[in-house]
């Protein structure tokens, strides 16, 4: 049985929610002839540690980035920590670690980053940090001195505030801890994103001499740009993180053998960021049409009902959805919106609740929490509305389509590829337009029925679970065959 190293971030198996979790679980559950080893980088070490995994998941490596200063504090690695600490002398730090750290930082902050050099430095840092203590190296005063020295060489970075510089240093420091992880030898590496957690794949690919596949659901760099523009108010910090992020993404793309975005929109972004077009092949997400299908369910009310299934966070723009319901209420006074989804952003959740209260929509907008039966939730709705400001190829849309529901959604990411010809598209962050779409679908029964039939047919023709899984099986087989041919050729050369 071939082994696959699957690299995630705040996802399977600890976080049983969201589209990437659905995709990961589906992939693992459907490919029982492969053995999976899962690495999940955790932003919070107090994340859920109680979960059920299938037999073909033989190991889960949980890596905390915050809340633990050593990987060994969280997971038992071996009995040699004390020996590694003692080996990590001043000489080792100054003569071995600092030169590599300096080269790494120069590369990630360069507007002309050589991705081959950066990949080589990452591999060398890994080779060093598995032998010594990463904590002593990363927390040595010289490491901070080098970081500040490099910032001061660039006029724009030199004007970063102390707080912003320290935050940047600590975030990078925490993620370099990843390089100290020893990963088992595998036959294929599969990353569910192209971002910091995927740097593990750079050295794991070298150690296992195996192919690497990257599946981006939402293009990490695009979503990072949205975050930086929304939450970073210090201009030098914005530039710092945009340059840093671009170079991290580029080095991950550069070592990949295959990149499988979930939609053409993501493919366009990846090409614009420097990914080799010959490596890219779109594989759309697929939905289980045996589970998600039109069905009769009990409804609590006969009121015109709009449903959304989404996390309550800024990227789903639930505030826009609430505002749209307020506009739609003028045309359909008894309209109601049921929002199914959890939230990890307390401030944004409170903002949503305040918006409902300020607009006096308590009788029209209800937060239902998460659901384990989304197929029933979709079938309770008259229509589905999605207000996101960024998406990849969202499961919530194809699941709704599979349930034979008409959808109105913001035209972002791969949403158009799903809804074209069978739903309404509106511009993001336009509550007036979203409201108009809702009203149109709710009042025009013929149009709604037309979209319901077209959506159901399109999902069954193009976006089934079977089609998605079969595509990944073919990619795994192709990569394995190519790798076998390489090994055979290498062996023949050695024999000669």
Spell out what each predicted region is:
Residues 253, 370-371, 377-381:
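Short alpha-helical donor nucleotide-sugar binding micro-motif in glycosyltransferases
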Residues 265, 286:
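Carbohydrate-associated surface elements
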Residues 296-327, 338:
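Conserved donor-binding/catalytic core segment of Leloir-type glycosyltransferases
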Residues 336-350:
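Glycosyltransferase donor-sugar binding loop
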Residues 349-371:
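Nucleotide-activated donor-binding/catalytic signature segment of Leloir-type glycosyltransferases, i.e.
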Residues 389:
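Aromatic "clamp/platform" in nucleotide-sugar-dependent glycosyltransferases that forms part
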Residues 406-409:
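Short hydrophobic beta-strand element within catalytic cores of glycosyltransferases
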Residues 424-431, 440-445:
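Conserved acidic donor-binding segment of nucleotide-sugar-dependent glycosyltransferases
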């Amino acid at each position: 049985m071939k082994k696959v190293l699957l690299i995630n971030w705040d996802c399977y198996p600890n976080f049983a929610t969201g589209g990437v979790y659905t995709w990961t679980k589906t992939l693992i559950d459907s490919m029982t002839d492969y053995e999976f080893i899962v690495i999940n980088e955790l932003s919070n070490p107090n994340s859920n540690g109680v979960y059920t995994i299938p037999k073909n998941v033989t190991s889960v490596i949980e890596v905390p980035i915050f809340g633990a200063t050593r990987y060994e504090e969280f997971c038992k690695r071996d009995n040699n920590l004390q020996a590694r600490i003692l080996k990590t002398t001043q000489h080792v730090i100054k003569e071995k670690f600092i030169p590599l750290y300096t080269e790494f930082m120069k590369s990630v902050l360069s507007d002309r980053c050589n991705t081959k050099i950066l990949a080589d430095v990452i591999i060398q840092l890994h080779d060093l940090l598995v032998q010594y203590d990463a904590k002593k190296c990363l927390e040595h005063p010289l490491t901070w001195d080098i970081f500040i020295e490099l910032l001061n060489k660039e006029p724009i970075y030199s004007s970063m505030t102390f707080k912003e510089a320290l935050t940047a240093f600590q975030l990078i420091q925490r993620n370099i801890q990843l390089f100290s992880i020893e990963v088992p030898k595998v036959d294929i590496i599969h990353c569910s994103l192209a971002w910091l957690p995927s740097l593990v794949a750079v050295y794991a690919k070298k150690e296992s001499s195996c192919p690497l596949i990257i599946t981006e659901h939402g293009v990490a760099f695009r979503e990072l740009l949205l975050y930086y523009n929304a939450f970073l108010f210090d201009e030098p910090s914005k530039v710092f993180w945009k340059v840093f992020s671009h170079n991290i993404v580029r080095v991950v793309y550069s070592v990949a053998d295959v990149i499988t975005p979930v939609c053409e929109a993501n493919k366009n972004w990846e090409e614009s960021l420097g990914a080799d077009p010959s490596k890219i092949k779109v594989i759309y997400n697929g939905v289980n049409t045996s589970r998600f299908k039109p069905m009769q369910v009990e409804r609590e009310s006969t009121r015109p009902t709009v449903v959304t299934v989404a996390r309550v966070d800024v990227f789903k723009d639930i505030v826009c959805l609430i505002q749209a319901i307020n506009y739609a209420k003028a045309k359909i006074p008894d309209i109601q919106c049921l929002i199914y989804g959890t939230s990890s952003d307390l401030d944004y959740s409170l903002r949503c609740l305040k918006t409902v209260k300020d607009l006096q929509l308590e009788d029209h907008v209800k937060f239902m929490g998460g659901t384990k039966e989304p197929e029933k939730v979709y079938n309770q709705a008259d229509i589905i509305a999605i207000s996101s400001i960024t998406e990849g190829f969202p499961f919530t849309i194809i699941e709704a389509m599979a349930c034979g529901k008409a959808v109105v959604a913001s035209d972002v990411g791969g949403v158009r590829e799903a809804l074209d010809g069978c739903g309404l598209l509106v511009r993001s962050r336009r509550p007036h337009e979203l409201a108009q779409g809702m009203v149109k679908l709710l009042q025009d029964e013929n149009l709604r029925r037309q979209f319901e039939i077209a959506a159901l047919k399109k999902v069954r023709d193009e976006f089934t679970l079977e089609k998605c899984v079969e595509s990944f099986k073919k990619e795994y087989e192709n990569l394995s065959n190519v790798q076998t041919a390489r090994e055979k050729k290498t062996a023949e050369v050695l024999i000669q």
